[in-house]
Amino acid sequence: MSHTPPDLPGSAATIGLTIDTVLRRTDKTLLARGSFRGEPAAVKYLIDPDPFWAARWRHELNVYEVFGDTTPPVRIPRLLHTDRDRLLVLEWVDASPLAVERYPQRELDTREVNAVLDCITALNAWTYPAARFSPTFDYSERVARYQAKGYLTEGQREALDSLLARCGAPAQLNHGDPLASNILLNAGRSDSDDEAETTVVLVDWEFTGLFLPGFDFAMLHTQVGASTPVIRERIEAIVSETGIEAAFALNLAVVLTRELRLHHELPEDDPTRKRCLPIIEAAWTSASTRLQRIAAARPA
């Protein structure tokens, strides 16, 4: 039976919104399945009044509006309704997340790897409306902050500063948060043959913006690559072919130091910390060596 959770405004029914199932509720947001004026819909409602998350919510709304004005080269849910404050009503997409864990425990098959990488590559190559996007964060500030927190040595920071000086301004559009849970897969049937055709749908655009080349790849390399070595191999090939070694090494460092912080902040007996922290530490050891090597090499 349809109902409105107490978190949602009482006016939901007056705009033709009904809620069938609450899919997930965190301290930040409520995600539900329902219908909007007879059309299946996903409902995302901001619970946390923190100004940071309010700003991210407004940013995600802006991204959906950009996509409504200028069609992106990747599949996204359509924006059906918003109250411009806390409520997003989106087209319901029949697809499943790549995984629910931040670090998936299953290995992706070749079809899934191809679909994910093709999707991210298409987004990165898109000629986006330049006036509508800006850098998601300041790389120099991020590096300084993580050194102050103890996640970077002086030598590592110097290497990162050296690469930053080479890379120029962030100008590549990236999703910004391609967690496995934000990558939905929908295996349909191809019109030309009997094989299943895997479509990727990207959701949660709160951190979308301009980055140095390869940020999304750095996240996939770190998280999905932990259980799927072939995606790391494919990403390394893309990095080499496109000549973005310095930017990618920088992005890896940014991603991995954040992962170290997030997992060190978990309780010591937390199962996720116990499982993932050794993976992250091993990846950071390798990435740090790579960083120093590239920083020491003379630019071509």
What does each model-found stretch correspond to?
Residues D50, P97, I183, L210-L212, ...:
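Conserved protein kinase catalytic core
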Residues A13-F36:
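ATP-binding glycine-rich phosphate-binding loop
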Residues T4-T14, A125-G176, N186-R189, A196, ...:
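An alpha-helical support segment within catalytic cores of ATP-dependent transferases
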Residues G214-G243, L252-P271, E281-S286:
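Active-site activation/catalytic loop segments of kinase-like enzymes and analogous catalytic loops
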Residues D27-S35, A42-V43, D161-F215:
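Active-site acidic catalytic loop and adjacent metal/ATP-binding pocket
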Residues D85-P97:
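Conserved short submotifs of the Hanks-type protein kinase catalytic core
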Residues A41-T82, P104-A122:
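A conserved alpha-helical element in kinase catalytic cores
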Residues P278-A300:
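C-terminal, non-catalytic tails of nucleotide-sugar-dependent glycosyltransferases
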